[in-house]
Amino acid sequence: KNYYKIDSGSSTTNADMKLTGAYMLAKYGYSENLSLGLTLGGNKSEAKLSMSKVKGNSGYLGAFAENYRGNLTLKAGAGVQYSEYDANRSTLGGHSYSDKYSDMTYDIYLNGRYSNPIGDNLFLESYATLSYTYVDQDGANEGSKALAIDTDSQSFEYTVGKVGVDLKKVIPHEKGKSTLSAGVSYTRIFDGADEEHITGRFKGGSDFDILVGHKNEHSVGVNAKYALELENGVIFDVKGSYSVERDSHNGSGKNKAKGEWIAGAGMGYKF
């Protein structure tokens, strides 16, 4: 952190993130207007920067409830995720460091979706989601090498809202039905987008601040999905989305927009 306002120039850092995961969802019709469900999932992640790389494994467990009020579906849920990471850092001087650390993530969310019929098996669906996430991250210890860094544990909080609209077409056929949908969405980080600092220190040295860059508050996205539901209970779907953030600035940095692709496929059985 530049306490003395020295002109220290600028630098550009590029980061690429890859996430691969799977999840299982179970839902039980508790009553005519209420369903209860569980979500169990896991993923592998890999983040690459110019001089470092972090690989992670995560497991997620969540529960939710859905309430049906005519064309309106209300959903509330909560979950917890445990993640472990292997981090590797290199320096221009040829030194390399590694460490393992973990974090716990807790989230709660509320969602509402209204389905408005506008034609023959054609629906215009609008939705809104509000979520709160709390992350408790362990400190890091790179060992006893020269210029190895220790960091303190740190917590982060985010409050995020999302609104969107989908156009959905249901196509009945002899052995079940197919559903095609496509839409647009807007996401806003209400709280937690500002830059933060993690306290670190070289071995035997004094404390210094490590910058956690600010986040882009606004993003827009498009999505598409195809789902097949057969009379024998088999369910299959494929979906994809693309989102892009607006370039954002603060007093010490700029986040340049970078698109994000998400693709997925699922298969299940409906009892």
Regions found by a protein language model. Give the residues of each.
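Outer membrane beta-barrel transmembrane domains
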Residues: 36, 62, 66-67, 151-271
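Short, internal active-site loops enriched in acidic
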Residues: 43-44, 131-133, 185-189
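Beta-strand segments within the central parallel beta-sheet cores of soluble alpha/beta enzyme folds
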Residues: 77, 125-126, 180-183
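Solvent-exposed, glycine/polar-rich loop segments of beta-barrel outer-membrane systems
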Residues: 9-14, 50-52, 84-102, 136-157, ...
